[in-house]
Regions:
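Conserved N-terminal alpha-helix of the aminotransferase class I/II PLP-enzyme fold
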Residues: 24-71, 97-100
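N-terminal "arm"/small-domain region of PLP-dependent enzymes with the aminotransferase-like
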Residues: 1-33
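Conserved PLP-enzyme active-site core in the AAT-like
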Residues: 3, 10, 42-43, 55, ...
Length: 184
């Protein structure tokens, strides 16, 4: 089927660099091939620089941003866990939907779409639900373009609650200090 060229300017998918497209013409490497493992190690090291973390478990997920968020939630949440989720756009709302599908009890911290969520509201919610498994928020909400402040949420790291941040839109464009902000 002949396809016409497209210029993709949305948050994803996007047009790859010609070098990336050319790489598709090369023979595949198996996932246990020493060259593949070296490439994966290099990729993880570069990701650690972008995420500003020293965590050796920094790794890419082969899928959409929503697939990454879902992978995170299904590995962290069990039925009857509490998830506190900041919602000020489509992707905060999607977090709620995925958490509910995991069987979690969702505590929504809603803000008008297009306005940032006051981080103190999330901190106060965690204090009200001290056994919450996660506090989750989108760093830069794709649907509205609003940036939510994450640094104050580092206080959550002093509890047993995990801090989950969706940085699909912001990573690489806005500094994200995973270690400094104590993001799990």
């Amino acid at each position: 089927v002949p396809l016409t060229d497209r210029l993709l300017l949305g948050p994803g998918p996007s047009n790859p660099y010609p070098e990336a497209t050319a790489a598709f013409t090369r023979p595949l490497l198996g996932h246990m091939d020493p060259e593949f493992l070296a490439l994966m190690d290099e990729t993880m090291e570069r990701l650690r620089a972008v995420f500003q973390t020293s965590n050796p478990l920094t790794l890419p997920i082969s899928g959409t941003g929503s697939a990454g968020m879902e992978a995170c939630f299904v590995n962290l949440l069990e039925p009857r866990d509490t998830a506190i989720i900041g919602v000020n756009g489509v992707f905060g709302n999607r977090m709620c939907e995925v958490a509910m599908r995991c069987g979690a009890e969702v505590v929504r911290i809603d803000e008008e779409w297009g306005k940032p969520i006051d981080p103190q509201l999330l901190i106060n919610a965690q204090k009200s639900y001290p056994h919450a498994r996660v506090v989750a928020v989108v760093h830069a909400e794709t649907s509205t373009g609003v940036e939510n402040e994450i640094a104050p949420l580092a206080a959550i790291a002093d509890t047993d609650t995990l801090l989950v941040v969706d940085a699909v839109t912001s990573l690489g464009g806005i500094p994200i200090d995973v270690d400094g902000w104590r993001i799990d």
